Amino acid sequence: MTARLPKVLAEYFAATNAHDVGAMIAAFTEGATVHDEGRDHVGVTAIRAWMTETIDKYDYQVEPIESARDGSRAVVLVSLRGRFPGSPITLQYAFTLSGEKVARLEIGG
């Protein structure tokens, strides 16, 4: 199944799979927060560092499976495959949108 995504999220996932950190970070507000693996990454500088670190560490690709949207919140179920034990895995990406940008991303199982 292909998930129907808001434009900013479709662009974010395409950039993620291309490992294009510049295009990935363009999806976020200046003061955005990403919560992943128990840590918060606040602001575009910290988020850019997190993106670079995770790409280098896991060399991953992500495939959106399904999505749901309620106002400014979009939840996307993804299949994530890469260089880590148990690959591929299914994760939930919960986005809070602010206009056409991502203000918060929470990644969890």
Indicate residue ranges for each PLM-predicted region.
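Short, low-complexity N-terminal intrinsically disordered segments enriched in polar/charged residues
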Residues: M1-A26
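Hydrophobic/anchoring residues in structured secondary elements
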Residues: V34, S67-R69, I107
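Surface-exposed, charged secondary-structure patches
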Residues: R48-Q92
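Short beta-strand edge/turn micro-motifs at domain boundaries
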Residues: T90-G109
